Amino acid sequence: MKIVAFTLVAFVALAGASCPYAAPAAAPAPAAPSGYPAPPCPTNYLFSCQPNLAPAPCAQEAPAYGSAGAYTEQVPQYVGNPSREQVQQFHQRIGMAALMEELRGLGQGIQGQQY
């Protein structure tokens, strides 16, 4: 194992010594400045469908919440937790709808039969 490792190291050293050293190429200069400059910190812009920009004031920070107080919108609550009675009524409605669909299918099957 030592002989294989020594041979490999010698081969790499020989290959490295035989290649002339070339300095790395310099990075190309950018043709144009990249990106857009950021707007000043206290100014926010609201974007609309029109191409114009309108400045919008920032909300004041709430002292108790830090920067989280700047967000004044409430999180919408679409559906509350249903009560046990509401869950039972829902399951009854689903069961009745499935039963009616099954009976409708059976009725159509009987009517389609030829005697």
Curated annotation (Swiss-Prot):
Keywords: Secreted, Signal. Its main location: secreted. GO terms for cellular component: egg chorion; extracellular space; vitelline envelope. The keyword Signal applies. One of its GO terms (molecular function) is structural constituent of vitelline membrane. It comes from the Eukaryota. Residues 35-72 form the VM domain. Transmembrane segments: none annotated. One of its GO terms (biological process) is vitelline membrane formation involved in chorion-containing eggshell formation. It is found in: Secreted. Pfam families: Vitelline_membr. Residues 1-17 form the signal peptide. Belongs to the vitelline membrane family. Major early eggshell protein. This is Vitelline membrane protein Vm32E. The lineage of its organism: Eukaryota, Metazoa, Ecdysozoa, Arthropoda, Hexapoda. The gene is Vm32E.
